[in-house]
Amino acid sequence: YTFVGRLVSGALLWFCAIAGAVQSQDYTHFSTDDEANNIEIFKRTSPSVVNITNARRVRTFYSLNPQDVPQGSGTGFVWDTQGHIVTNFHVVQQADRVLVTLQDGMTFDAVPVGVAPNHDLAVLKIEADNVELTPIVPGDSSLLEVGRKVVAIGNPFGLDTTMTVGVVSALGREIDSVTRRKISDVIQTDAAINPGNSGGPLLNSLGELVGVNTAIYSPSGGSSGIGFAIPANTVNRIVPELIQFGRIQTPILGINLLPQAEYYRRLWKIDGVIVLDTIAGGEPERLGMRGLTRVDGGRIRLGDVIVRLDEESISNENDLAAFLENKRAGERVTVTTRRDNRVLEYEIELQAPPSP
C-alpha cells in the first residue's frame, strides 16, 4: 500500500508540474473576455492621453530674472488632429506656462484656447503639425447605467499612462466647481482616481469618452473609491464653443443678479433668483421687470424674484445657470416672477452674451 500510495502521489506531482508548465506556456495567449477588453481599450486609447505640467513665472530673491517653477501635473486628452487638448480648468489655473507631453515622450508648449471655470474644463492647443495625433473617440454619457464598466487613464502622482478599472457607482451627482458653481449630472465611479488623474478620460467598454475625471472624495487626498467625472455630453457641448469663441456661449436674460444672494434669501425668507436690476435697453426693462429699489429711509424694496423658467422651478442661481446652459440665443422663454405678493409672467427672447 505504501508503494502504491507513493506511486499515486508521484503521478499527481508529475501531472501538476506538467499542467503548470502548460498553463505558464499558454498564459501569454490566454485572457478572459474582460481582460481582453481592458487590453484593447488601453492599446487603442492611451495614445490619446497626454501629461500636462504647469509652471508659474517667479522672481527669486537672488535673481531678477523670472524662472519657471513647476506647480503640478495633470492629465488631458487629444480632442482633434488640429492639436486641441482638453483638460480640467483647475489643472492649468494660474499657470504661466503649460507643457503637454504625448505618450511617445514628445513635449510641446501649449497655449490656452478657452476655459469654462464653472464646468472645470479648459481647451489648450499645441503646434504639432508634423505629428500624427490620435483624437479621443467621443461617446454618449446619457447611455450610462449604474454598474457599467468604466476605465480611467491618466497620470496619478506623475506616473504616466496609468489605467484603472471600475464601474459607474452613481449618476446625477452634483459637485462644486472652482468658482463654487454646481456642476450637475456628474458621474460617480469607483475606478481609482488620484491626484494627477484630473483632466483625463473616463471611458466605456468601447473605449469611448464618457467623462472627464475631475475630483475625488477623500479625507486623505488619495483614492477612496469615490471619484467624479464631468459627463461627456457636457464636454461634447462645451468644447466646440471654447474652440470657436474661447468661452461658453450661454445666453443671457438681460438682467443682473444680486451678489451674495443666498444670504439675502435667508434674510428675507424667500426662494428664487433675486433681480438686482435690468440691463438698459433690454427686453426685461421694456416689459417692466423691476430690480431692487431704495425707498424712504434708505430701506431696500424687493423687486422681481424669478421662481420659474418655462416649466422648471428656479430656487437659486445654480438652477438658472443650468437652465440657460441648455438654451441658445434667440429662443423665447416664459419667465415667472413674484413681486409684492403677485405672480407675473414675461415672455423674453434670450440674448447672446456680450463680447468680453
Question: How would you name each of these model-derived features?
Answer:
Residues 1-5:
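N-terminal secretory signal peptides that target proteins for export/translocation
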Residues 6-19:
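Bacterial N-terminal signal peptides
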Residues 22-270, 277-280, 298, 317-321, ...:
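Serine-dependent protease modules
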Residues 85-86, 284-317:
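Conserved PDZ fold ligand-binding element
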Residues 270-271, 290:
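Short coil/loop linkers at secondary-structure junctions
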Residues 271-274, 305:
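Charged active-site motifs of nucleotide-sugar-dependent glycosyltransferases
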